[in-house]
From Swiss-Prot:
Domain of life: Bacteria
InterPro entries, sorted: ATPase_NBD, GppA/Ppx_hydrolase, Guo-5TP_3DP_PyrP, Ppx_GppA_C, Ppx_GppA_N, PyroPPase_GppA_Ppx
Documented EC number(s): 3.6.1.40
Gene for this chain: gppA
Catalysis: reaction(s): guanosine 3'-diphosphate 5'-triphosphate + H2O = guanosine 3',5'-bis(diphosphate) + phosphate + H(+)
Name of the molecule in the record: Guanosine-5'-triphosphate,3'-diphosphate pyrophosphatase
Higher taxonomy: Bacteria, Pseudomonadati, Pseudomonadota, Gammaproteobacteria, Enterobacterales
Stated role: Catalyzes the conversion of pppGpp to ppGpp. Guanosine pentaphosphate (pppGpp) is a cytoplasmic signaling molecule which together with ppGpp controls the 'stringent response', an adaptive process that allows bacteria to respond to amino acid starvation, resulting in the coordinated regulation of numerous cellular activities.
Amino acid sequence: MNSTSLYAAIDLGSNSFHMLVVREASGSIQTLTRIKRKVRLAAGLNNDNHLSAEAMERGWQCLRLFAERLQDIPQPQIRVVATATLRLAVNAGEFIAKAQTILGCPVQVISGEEEARLIYQGVAHTTGGADQRLVVDIGGASTELVTGTGAQTTSLFSLSMGCVTWLERYFSDRNLAQENFDDAEKAARDVLRPVADELRFHGWKVCVGASGTVQALQEIMMAQGMDERITLAKLQQLKQRAIQCGRLEELEIEGLTLERALVFPSGLAILIAIFTELNIQSMTLAGGALREGLVYGMLHLAVDQDIRSRTLRNIQRRFIVDTDQANRVAKLADNFLKQVENAWHIEPISRELLLSACQLHEIGLSVDFKQAPYHAAYLVRHLDLPGYTPAQKKLLATLLLNQTNPVDLSSLHQQNAVPPRVAEQLCRLLRLAILFAGRRRDDLVPEITLQALNENLTLTLPGDWLAHHPLGKELIDQESQWQSYVHWPLDVR
C-alpha cells in the first residue's frame, strides 16, 4: 500500500489515548486501525495539578504501542494532540518531551476552544440529520459544548469538568448514593450555567453526543432493545438502576461493559446536568469527533452538505450498482409513499431511510444473484456508513433482507430505529417499488394508484395491464400471497 495515502490522528485524552489510522481513497476515508487504551491520565493529577510519575509512565507505555504503527506513515500526515489534563498539568512539558521522542513527531497541546472546533468538524463530516446542531463531548477532564450550522461553528465552550475528575471528586468513596449524584449534578450545573444562555441563543435542531459516556448509553439501549434516542427520562432511569447497585464495583447494567463502568456514573451525572440546564429533548450518538476532525482537517475535505448522499454514492460506486435502476426504484417508492402518507403519517426520517434502502437494494448482486437480499443485508450491517446511526443501519439491513421472498416479520420487529409498524409499512412500499420497476425501463412502469386504509393496501392498475402482462400478474399474485402470510392485506385491481 502506498504510504502517502495513509493518515494518522492521535488524541492524548484525559481518560483514554486513541489512535486512528485511515487511508484516503477518492475523497472518502477508509479506517484501517483504531487503537484505544485507558490511560486515565487525569487520575494522576494532584491538587496542585502535578502529574504523577505513574500516570506519565502509563501514557508513555501506550505511546510505545502507537509508535510502532506510525513508522509507515509520512510525518506531515500525522497529527498528535493533547487535551485537558496536559493543558492543566504544571509538569506537562516533561511528559510531552518524552512523548515526542517516543513517537518521533510533534505533540501539540490544543486549547479547549480548538478541541471543541475539531470535535465539531469530526461530527459535521460523519453525522447525518439536520445541520443546525449542538454537539456535546464529555471527556475525562473537560466537556466541550459547540453549536453550529453545517461546517461553521456559532459558539464554542470547553468546561473544566469530565468523567474522570468528577469520579475522583464526587464518587471517590465508590458509593453510588443519591447524595453522590446530587452533588455531582449540582456542581456540573454550576459549571454550565454561565454558558447556557449563549448556547440557547444560537439554538439547535438536533443534539449530538460524541463521547464514551454517550457511546456507553447507546450500547445499553441497544442491548435492552430500546430505541437509540437518549432522553432525560432514560438517563434518570439508569441513574436509579446505578443507585440500586449501591457501589461502583457492583455496578451492573445490561449492555454496560466493564471497561466503561468505572467512569459511567460520573459521566451520567454530567449528562443529566447538561440535559436539565439546556432543556435538551433528545440526543443521538455522533459518527465521529476529535480524531475524525483531525483527519479531515489534514485532508482538506469540504464538509458535504448531505453526508448520507455521499455515503450512498461511495457505496454504489464500490459495488458497481446500477444507479439508474436504484433511482427508478426510489422514485416509485417515493410516489407510493406520497399516495399513502395521509393514512400512514410516515415521518421525513423514515422516508429518507426508505429511499436509502432503494439506493442500496442491489448491492447484494455484487456477491451473487443467489441469496442477493442476504448478501445486501450482510454488507449494510458491516459496512461503515457515515451519516447513519447503528439503529438506522440495522433497519436498512432488515429492509434489504426482506426486499423479496417470504417476509421475516421478526427481523422487522427486532430493529429499533422506527416503530415495528412503520418498519412493516416501509418494507411493503420497498417490495412493491422493486417489483414494478423490475423491467428496468421508465417507459414500462405502469401508472399505479395505491390507497391505504389502516393496514389494508389497494393497488389499482390500468384496465388491461394484467391481461397483457402474464409474468407481471404472476409476480403480483405471488407478492400478494407473501404479504397475506404476515397479515398484510394487499388487494390488486
